[in-house]
Amino acid sequence: MVPPVQVSPLIKFGRYSALIIGMAYGAKRYSYLKPRAEEERRIAAEEKKRLDELKRIERELAEAQDDSILK
């Protein structure tokens, strides 16, 4: 087995600093994007509900035309 290599404290400091900065950036970015994603999901749900209602009405109208007395 190969013995561990001595790494400069400056390099260790740089690595851990980059790790911590990356984690902080990710947390900040996540908190920025989360409300936007929730808003997009809410809008998509409202749009889906509206389209489902239109399809239901269209289907009822088609059934009403098929069941008309004047056949």
UniProtKB/Swiss-Prot annotation:
<comment type="function">
    <text>Subunit e, of the mitochondrial membrane ATP synthase complex (F(1)F(0) ATP synthase or Complex V) that produces ATP from ADP in the presence of a proton gradient across the membrane which is generated by electron transport complexes of the respiratory chain. ATP synthase complex consist of a soluble F(1) head domain - the catalytic core - and a membrane F(1) domain - the membrane proton channel. These two domains are linked by a central stalk rotating inside the F(1) region and a stationary peripheral stalk.</text>
</comment>
<feature type="modified residue" description="N6-acetyllysine">
    <location>
        <position position="34"/>
    </location>
</feature>
<dbReference type="GO" id="GO:0045259">
    <property type="term" value="C:proton-transporting ATP synthase complex"/>
</dbReference>
<keyword id="KW-0406">Ion transport</keyword>
<protein>
    <recommendedName>
        <fullName>ATP synthase F(0) complex subunit e, mitochondrial</fullName>
    </recommendedName>
</protein>
<keyword id="KW-0496">Mitochondrion</keyword>
<feature type="modified residue" description="Phosphoserine">
    <location>
        <position position="68"/>
    </location>
</feature>
<dbReference type="GO" id="GO:0046933">
    <property type="term" value="F:proton-transporting ATP synthase activity, rotational mechanism"/>
</dbReference>
<dbReference type="InterPro" id="IPR008386">
    <property type="entry name" value="ATP_synth_F0_esu_mt"/>
</dbReference>
<comment type="subunit">
    <text>Component of the ATP synthase complex composed at least of ATP5F1A/subunit alpha, ATP5F1B/subunit beta, ATP5MC1/subunit c (homooctomer), MT-ATP6/subunit a, MT-ATP8/subunit 8, ATP5ME/subunit e, ATP5MF/subunit f, ATP5MG/subunit g, ATP5MK/subunit k, ATP5MJ/subunit j, ATP5F1C/subunit gamma, ATP5F1D/subunit delta, ATP5F1E/subunit epsilon, ATP5PF/subunit F6, ATP5PB/subunit b, ATP5PD/subunit d, ATP5PO/subunit OSCP.</text>
</comment>
<keyword id="KW-0813">Transport</keyword>
<keyword id="KW-0138">CF(0)</keyword>
<comment type="similarity">
    <text>Belongs to the ATPase e subunit family.</text>
</comment>
<keyword id="KW-0472">Membrane</keyword>
<dbReference type="GO" id="GO:0044877">
    <property type="term" value="F:protein-containing complex binding"/>
</dbReference>
<dbReference type="GO" id="GO:0042776">
    <property type="term" value="P:proton motive force-driven mitochondrial ATP synthesis"/>
</dbReference>
<keyword id="KW-0375">Hydrogen ion transport</keyword>
<keyword id="KW-0066">ATP synthesis</keyword>
<keyword id="KW-0999">Mitochondrion inner membrane</keyword>
<dbReference type="GO" id="GO:0005743">
    <property type="term" value="C:mitochondrial inner membrane"/>
</dbReference>
<dbReference type="GO" id="GO:0005739">
    <property type="term" value="C:mitochondrion"/>
</dbReference>
<keyword id="KW-0007">Acetylation</keyword>
<dbReference type="Pfam" id="PF05680">
    <property type="entry name" value="ATP-synt_E"/>
</dbReference>
<keyword id="KW-0597">Phosphoprotein</keyword>
